[in-house]
């Protein structure tokens, strides 16, 4: 008689995705980040749910309610610290996951990749509206600056901004709707994650060699379930260490001050994981141009599959493009640094050079390097 996990209508879906799934035998630790992102999402959903039970989305009481959570709610300080720092770990895993996709050519699974980019945008939106909720100085001014970017939309821009605000400035209506969005979006992310997996399982996983691995597949359980559990343990150890020993390390000191529309903080900047995009936005001395650059800094990922010129899939045996890949990583780090410093010389020019390099790598240098390597191997 067949096992229940293979016959039950619901269990057989889980079985084909998590137990009997044929996986390449040689996928490395870089393939752990997908499941780590799943763990991050579950952690954020649970901690967020418990925070929402005590939070009030009203400008008079929002800041106080967060203080109340940290002081008076049983383990509220821990739940809040896990949630705030969990977002940082979510983005660390996201960037590692995207970097893995770029390095090993996983973007050639175009549907899976594009849904992944949409997921990335959704998580960024969720994070942004969540950052506004504590209603500190950086929450308020961050919301003001970023929503104001919508005013660059031709003709309807100003109306669009007021529509998002629910009034003539960032006010109570804005906070209330942002809380509603922050509660809703993670479930949308969860739904898109299911689609992401659905499309991935149509093709099967890629692997470090970039060649077809059908001849050498192993079951996901127990091999990769245990491998993933090790990743879970390492990440949770890092998250709890950060949440317990240095919970405010990655936050902004300005957010300990309640929002004040009269006083602007000296440097308005987003959370560290958005600084690279913020640097690209600031590097163009034109509002519309900056907004478009900001948008395309993420959407450029969608064109990567169509600019793949190499006859090989990954970068495992492509030293020239490997070098460019690590230049991209260094460039992202430079942009992250520039996004967090004041707009003055020499930071302005460094940011502009780093921004030009960022787009050049994706749109020009990677495709050129692929063609060069084909020529060197006489594969043209």
Swiss-Prot record:
Miscellaneous comment text of the record:
Heme 1 (or BL or b562) is low-potential and absorbs at about 562 nm, and heme 2 (or BH or b566) is high-potential and absorbs at about 566 nm.
Pfam families, per database record: Cytochrom_B_C, Cytochrome_B
Q: What the protein does?
A: Component of the ubiquinol-cytochrome c reductase complex (complex III or cytochrome b-c1 complex) that is part of the mitochondrial respiratory chain. The b-c1 complex mediates electron transfer from ubiquinol to cytochrome c. Contributes to the generation of a proton gradient across the mitochondrial membrane that is then used for ATP synthesis.
Q: Does the keyword tRNA processing apply?
A: no
What does the note under cofactor report?
Binds 2 heme b groups non-covalently.
A Gene Ontology annotation in the biological process aspect, one of them, is: mitochondrial electron transport, ubiquinol to cytochrome c
| Regions crossing the membrane | 33-53, 77-98, 113-133, 178-198, 226-246, 288-308, 320-340, 347-367
PROSITE patterns attached here? CYTB_CTER, CYTB_NTER
Subunit info?
A: The cytochrome bc1 complex contains 3 respiratory subunits (MT-CYB, CYC1 and UQCRFS1), 2 core proteins (UQCRC1 and UQCRC2) and probably 6 low-molecular weight proteins.
What is stated as this protein's family in its record? Belongs to the cytochrome b family.
Per UniProt, heme b b566 binds at 97, 196
Q: How does this chain sit within the bilayer?
A: Multi-pass membrane protein
Provide the residue positions that the database annotates as binding a ubiquinone: 201
**Keyword Electron transport (UniProt):** yes
Query: Can you provide one Gene Ontology molecular function annotated for this UniProt record?
Result: metal ion binding
Cofactor names: heme b
Record keywords, A-Z: Electron transport, Heme, Iron, Membrane, Metal-binding, Mitochondrion, Mitochondrion inner membrane, Respiratory chain, Transmembrane, Transmembrane helix, Transport, Ubiquinone
What Gene Ontology cellular component terms go with this record? mitochondrial inner membrane; respiratory chain complex III
Indicate what this protein is called per its UniProt record. Cytochrome b
Checking InterPro entries in the record gives: Cyt_b/b6_C, Cyt_b/b6_C_sf, Cyt_b/b6_N, Cytb/b6-like_sf, Cytochrome_b, Cytochrome_b_C_euk/bac, Cytochrome_b_N_euk/bac, Di-haem_cyt_TM
Where is it localised? Mitochondrion inner membrane
Alphabetical list of SUPFAM superfamilies matching this protein: a domain/subunit of cytochrome bc1 complex (Ubiquinol-cytochrome c reductase) (SSF81648), Transmembrane di-heme cytochromes (SSF81342)
In which residues is heme b b562 bound? 83, 182
Record organism: Gadus morhua (Atlantic cod)
Q: Which residues form the signal peptide?
A: none
């Amino acid at each position: 008689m067949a096992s229940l996990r293979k016959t039950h209508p619901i269990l057989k879906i889980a079985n084909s995705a998590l137990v009997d799934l044929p996986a390449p035998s040689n996928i490395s630790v870089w393939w752990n980040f997908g499941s780590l992102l799943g763990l991050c999402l579950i952690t954020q959903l649970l901690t967020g749910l418990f925070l929402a039970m005590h939070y009030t989305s009203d400008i008079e009481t929002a800041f106080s309610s967060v203080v109340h959570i940290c002081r008076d709610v049983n383990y509220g300080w821990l739940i809040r610290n896990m949630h705030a720092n969990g977002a940082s770990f979510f983005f660390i895993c996201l960037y590692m996951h995207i970097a893995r996709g770029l390095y090993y050519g996983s973007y050639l699974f175009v549907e899976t990749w594009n849904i992944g980019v949409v997921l990335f945008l959704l998580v960024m939106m969720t994070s942004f509206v969540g950052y506004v909720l504590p209603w500190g100085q950086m929450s308020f001014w961050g919301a003001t600056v970023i929503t104001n970017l919508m005013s660059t939309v031709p003709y309807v821009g100003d109306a669009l901004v007021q529509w998002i605000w629910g009034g003539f400035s960032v006010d109570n209506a804005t906070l209330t709707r942002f809380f509603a969005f922050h509660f809703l979006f993670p479930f949308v992310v969860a739904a898109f994650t299911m689609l992401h997996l659905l499309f991935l399982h149509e093709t099967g996983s890629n692997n470090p060699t970039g060649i077809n691995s059908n001849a050498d597949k192993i079951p996901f359980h127990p091999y990769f379930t245990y491998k993933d559990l090790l990743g879970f343990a390492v990440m949770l150890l890092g998250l709890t260490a950060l949440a317990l020993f240095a919970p405010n390390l990655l936050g902004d000191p300005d957010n300990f001050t309640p929002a004040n529309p009269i006083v602007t903080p000296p440097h308005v900047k987003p959370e560290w994981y958005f600084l690279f995009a913020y640097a690209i936005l600031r590097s163009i001395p034109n509002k519309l141009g900056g907004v478009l650059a900001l948008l395309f800094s993420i959407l450029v990922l969608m064109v990567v599959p169509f600019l793949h010129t190499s006859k090989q899939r990954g970068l495992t045996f492509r030293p020239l493009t490997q070098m460019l890949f690590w230049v991209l990583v260094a460039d992202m780090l430079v942009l992250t640094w520039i996004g967090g410093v004041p707009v003055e010389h020499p930071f302005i020019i460094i940011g502009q050079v780093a921004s030009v390099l960022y787009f050049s790598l994706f749109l020009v240098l990677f495709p050129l390097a692929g063609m060069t390597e084909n020529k060197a191997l006489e594969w043209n």
